[in-house]
Every structure is written in structure tokens, then in C-alpha cells.
């Protein structure tokens, strides 16, 4: 099988040296993402495209899907690479591939050619188009706005029959820009802002301020791991968790009610800046949008920024909430965000929307900053690739099984789309579908006399959810890994 990777247009307008560097980085990213799919896979870079070749046909859908989620790729052409001897030979190889798709449709032929030939691209379009029109009675040529466009590429003595075109996510390859640290909460905003910086070529590390115990951290780890695994797995990244409950307690005790929200955000920026400096990260990323809540007015944002020299990026600053939710749905984080626990440890009854610097600094004089230093020093830092292993260790009391007993039932916790694409069928046992994002509210409605074997494709989500259900008091759960 062969795929032709077309570059994001902004890459092609760079200077020669920058363009070559971007293409080289993108080629490396593709290799890193695809290396586990096929050992024979080859990635070859060219000036205007990248080729991916593999032999394992069973991996075709997985490779194609993975390519559509790598930043820097505009679109992917799935092609059949065959030799040809003449114009008529090109037509004969095109006809069987496109006959069914063109029946009853209008069409045109578009050709791109590289190398020296006795014919022009237009001559190929006319010859092949005329032949298809003659041999498919219900098809009709239409050069403008046709139902189907037959795309052919000719490279020297090889014909690339384009079997399908798939859109990528665009942007710049990860690694072409410097690292950033995303302040992730698991909600709509922070997930989308993290994705936007990945798409712009940054390696995104994650910093989580835990205000709500283990269950909250498990949920946020799921979001971070999902984003990394889906869009950024070409690079190693960190997940830093800071226990912020002592800081919240100090704020509640020492800070005036109206100033609490801004002071909390300033403490978070201070802590995140220390983490960023420790790991050589150039900027922080937040999901703040102008005017969305009281701490996100221009006055308050300026005061929050003032506590650190570290650059703070806010990619969603002008976005509406509805648009942010649409983006979350598009990238697959909406379901996580909708079910994420909300912890409102610091909510002022009358929060200020126009904080005064002198008042904020006066309130912060009451704060014991050794508490902030201590929680930053004690912050946990893990490689995001180890989240699965750490979760496995954390749920050691939850048995992992390869088979099932008479009183067992399998619980498929994948998303609805995944279940529809690949339905789980196991003989001899009941299989029940309950997406992971409904477990917190719906698991208790299931037959609790049964033992439920949680299953997902990679096993990460099932282990995370097993730990969550254990914490909620359910002992009748196991992890199913056949």
C-alpha cells in the first residue's frame, strides 16, 4: 500500500532551508507515530510531498486514520502504484478502479505529472476521460463542479491511481516550534487550547492543579493522555500534577472574598511558571476567553499576567463558548469535559471584575508563600506514556482477566462511534455497551449481582475507569484484556 502525504500550504511558502527542516521533522514524526503499525513501513521525503509505503494490508485503515491526525499534513492520497506503457494502458488501469464509482455520475479527470513523457497532462485527461465516458454508459463528463473527480498522478514510468483522499488537520509539525506548558483542567477550554498549540507545531506538556482528589486527577489524566495519544504521540511529554488544596485552604482563610478568584489564578501562574522554568518550557497555555468568567476581564487578566515573566498564550481569547464546545466535539474531548467533576473550592460570592493591583498585593501579603513553594516542590512529574502503566499499578486490586465466568458480563466502554465502527462480539457472554463518559451516572443502574468486565481497545481507559468505580465503592469490576 502507498500513501502520498501533501504538506500544509504554509509550509510550502517558507524559505528553502526552513521548508526542508519542517519536512524533515514531519517525516520523523510520521515514523514515530506509525512505527508500531508495520515493521516494514518506509517513509520517504520529497520536496513537495512525503511517501508512506507499507506491506501489511491489515493495517491500512489504522495507518490512514493515524496520518489524518498528525499536525503538518494537509491531506493524504491513498494510491495504487502501478507501471504503465502507454496512454491506453493508463486508461485500462483506471477503468476497473473507477467504473462503479462513476455509474450515474458526472465526472472529470485531473492529472498531475512528474518526469519526461511524450504526452502532456491535458492529453492524459482527455484520453482517459473520453475512454471512461465511452465505456460507462450512465456516466457523463462535466468539467466544472462534477459529482466525482478522477485524480491521477504520473511519476516517470509509474501511474499512481488515487483511490481516496483524506483531509489532515493541517498546521505545523510538532517540534518546529518550542515547547509549551498547558494548564489543563479537563474542561472544554483547556483541552481545545492544548490541541490548538499542538496543531501549531508545539510540543505540549500538561500541568494540572488538583483541587478535588484522586477522582479529578484520574479524569484529567484521561483527557491529557487522549490528546497526546491522538494528536501528539510523536513526542514524549510530561504530565505534572500539583496538589493545590493547601493553597486553596490558605486563600479561603487569609484572602478577602472578592479577591479570591484573581489571587488563585495568580498563584496558579506563579506555580506553573516555576514548573516551566524547571523544564525549560517557553510559554504557558490557558483556555481563558475574554469575559467568560469574572477573572477573565482585561483588567484581571493583566493582573494575572503581571506575576510572571513567562509568556502566557490564550488561543481561545476571542472564541465563544459554543464555538469552543464545537471544537471539543470535533477533536473528541467533549464527552470528557461534560462528565468532568467540577471543584469550586474558591468561588467568591461577589468576585471583582476589575481588580485593583494594590488591593490584590495587599491581600497576598497575608498569604504564606512557603505553602506555594512546598506544593510545587512536591509536584508529581510523569512521562505521559507511563500513565497507562501507573494506572495499571494503581488498580492492582482490580483483577485483569483474559476469560470470563458464568456470572460475568463484558462492559464495552468505548465511545458510541467506536462501538458502531467495530462492534464487540464475544461468544458465550453478554456484552453491554455503556460509554465511559456515562459510567459515573449509569453504572449503578446495571445488574449489580453480576461481575462487570470493563473493556476498551487499548486497555488504558478500562483501567482508569476501574479505579474510578472502585473509589465510588463498586467492588464488582474487573478489567478484561483477552
Swiss-Prot record:
Question: Cystine bridges: which residues?
Answer: 344-456
Q: What class of enzyme is it?
A: transferase
Organism of derivation? Klebsiella pneumoniae (strain 342)
Rhodanese domain span: 404-482
* Pfam families the UniProt entry points to: ThiI, ThiI_fer, THUMP
Give the PROSITE patterns listed for this entry.
RHODANESE_3 (PS50206), THUMP (PS51165)
Q: Please, which domain of life does this record's source organism belong to?
A: Bacteria
Q: Which family does it belong to?
A: Belongs to the ThiI family.
Binding positions (ATP): 183-184, 265, 287, 296
Q: Which InterPro entries match?
A: Rhodanese-like_dom, Rhodanese-like_dom_sf, Rossmann-like_a/b/a_fold, ThiI_AANH, ThiI_fer, ThiI_N, THII_Thiazole_biosynth_dom, THUMP_dom
Q: What is its EC number?
A: 2.8.1.4
Where does this chain mainly localize? cytoplasm
Q: Does the keyword Secreted apply?
A: no
Location of the protein in the cell: Cytoplasm
Protein name listed in UniProt: tRNA sulfurtransferase
Q: Which UniProt keywords apply?
A: ATP-binding, Cytoplasm, Disulfide bond, Nucleotide-binding, Redox-active center, RNA-binding, Thiamine biosynthesis, Transferase, tRNA-binding
CDD domains noted in UniProt: PPase_ThiI (cd01712), THUMP_ThiI (cd11716)
Q: Is-annotated flag, keyword RNA-binding?
A: yes
What reaction(s) does this enzyme catalyze? [ThiI sulfur-carrier protein]-S-sulfanyl-L-cysteine + a uridine in tRNA + 2 reduced [2Fe-2S]-[ferredoxin] + ATP + H(+) = [ThiI sulfur-carrier protein]-L-cysteine + a 4-thiouridine in tRNA + 2 oxidized [2Fe-2S]-[ferredoxin] + AMP + diphosphate; [ThiS sulfur-carrier protein]-C-terminal Gly-Gly-AMP + S-sulfanyl-L-cysteinyl-[cysteine desulfurase] + AH2 = [ThiS sulfur-carrier protein]-C-terminal-Gly-aminoethanethioate + L-cysteinyl-[cysteine desulfurase] + A + AMP + 2 H(+)
Functional summary from the UniProt entry = Catalyzes the ATP-dependent transfer of a sulfur to tRNA to produce 4-thiouridine in position 8 of tRNAs, which functions as a near-UV photosensor. Also catalyzes the transfer of sulfur to the sulfur carrier protein ThiS, forming ThiS-thiocarboxylate. This is a step in the synthesis of thiazole, in the thiamine biosynthesis pathway. The sulfur is donated as persulfide by IscS.
Domain THUMP, by residue range, is 61-165
Q: Which GO terms describe its molecular function?
A: ATP binding; CCA tRNA nucleotidyltransferase activity; tRNA binding; tRNA-uracil-4 sulfurtransferase activity
Amino acid at each position: 500500500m502507498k500513501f502520498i502525504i501533501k504538506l500544509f500550504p504554509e509550509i510550502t511558502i517558507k524559505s528553502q532551508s526552513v521548508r526542508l527542516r519542517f519536512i524533515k521533522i514531519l517525516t520523523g514524526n510520521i515514523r514515530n507515530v506509525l512505527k508500531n503499525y508495520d515493521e516494514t513501513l518506509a517513509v520517504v521525503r520529497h520536496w513537495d510531498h512525503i511517501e508512506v509505503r507499507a506491506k501489511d494490508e491489515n493495517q491500512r485503515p489504522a495507518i490512514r486514520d493515524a496520518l489524518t491526525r498528525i499536525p503538518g499534513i494537509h491531506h493524504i492520497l491513498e494510491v495504487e502504484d502501478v507501471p504503465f506503457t502507454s496512454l491506453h494502458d493508463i486508461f485500462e488501469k483506471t477503468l476497473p478502479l473507477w467504473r462503479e464509482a462513476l455509474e450515474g455520475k458526472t465526472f472529470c479527470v485531473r492529472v498531475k505529472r512528474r518526469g519526461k513523457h511524450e504526452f502532456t497532462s491535458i492529453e492524459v485527461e482527455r484520453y482517459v476521460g473520453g475512454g471512461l465516458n465511452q465505456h460507462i454508459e450512465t456516466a457523463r463528463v462535466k468539467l466544472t463542479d462534477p459529482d466525482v473527480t478522477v485524480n491521477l498522478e504520473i511519476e516517470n514510468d509509474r501511474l499512481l491511481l488515487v483511490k481516496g483522499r483524506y483531509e489532515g488537520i493541517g498546521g505545523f509539525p510538532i517540534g518546529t516550534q518550542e515547547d509549551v506548558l498547558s494548564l489543563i483542567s479537563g474542561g472544554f477550554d483547556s483541552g481545545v487550547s492544548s490541541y490548538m498549540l499542538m496543531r501549531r507545531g508545539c510540543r505540549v506538556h500538561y500541568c494540572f492543579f488538583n483541587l478535588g482528589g484522586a477522582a479529578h486527577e484520574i479524569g484529567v489524566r484521561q483527557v491529557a493522555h487522549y490528546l497526546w495519544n491522538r494528536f501528539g504521540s510523536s513526542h514524549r511529554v510530561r504530565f505534572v500534577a500539583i496538589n493545590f488544596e493547601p493553597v486553596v485552604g490558605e486563600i479561603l482563610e487569609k484572602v478577602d472574598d472578592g479577591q479570591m478568584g484573581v489571587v488563585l489564578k495568580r498563584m496558579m501562574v506563579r506555580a506553573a511558571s516555576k514548573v516551566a522554568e524547571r523544564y525549560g518550557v517557553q510559554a504557558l497555555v490557558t483556555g481563558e476567553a475574554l469575559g467568560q468568567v469574572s477573572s477573565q476581564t482585561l483588567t484581571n487578566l493583566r493582573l494575572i499576567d503581571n506575576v510572571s515573566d513567562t509568556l502566557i498564550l490564550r488561543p481561545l481569547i476571542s472564541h465563544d463558548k459554543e464555538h469552543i464546545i464545537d471544537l471539543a466535539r470535533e477533536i473528541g474531548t467533549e464527552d470528557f469535559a461534560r462528565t468532568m467533576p467540577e471543584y469550586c473550592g474558591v468561588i467568591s460570592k461577589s468576585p471583582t471584575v476589575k481588580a485593583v493591583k494594590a488591593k490584590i498585593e495587599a491581600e497576598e501579603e497575608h498569604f504564606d508563600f512557603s505553602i506555594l513553594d512546598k506544593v510545587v516542590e512536591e509536584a508529581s512529574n510523569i512521562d505521559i506514556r507511563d500513565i497507562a502503566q501507573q494506572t495499571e499499578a494503581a488498580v492492582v486490586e482490580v483483577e485483569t482477566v483474559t476469560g470470563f465466568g458464568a456470572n460475568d458480563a463484558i462492559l464495552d466502554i468505548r465511545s458510541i462511534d467506536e462501538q458502531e465502527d467495530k462492534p464487540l462480539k464475544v461468544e458465550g457472554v453478554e456484552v453491554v455497551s455503556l460509554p465511559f463518559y456515562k459510567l459515573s451516572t449509569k453504572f449503578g443502574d446495571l445488574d449489580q449481582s453480576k461481575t462487570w468486565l470493563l473493556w476498551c481497545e487499548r486497555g488504558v481507559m478500562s483501567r482508569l475507569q476501574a479505579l474510578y468505580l472502585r473509589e465510588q465503592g463498586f467492588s464488582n469490576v474487573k478489567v478484561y484484556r483477552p
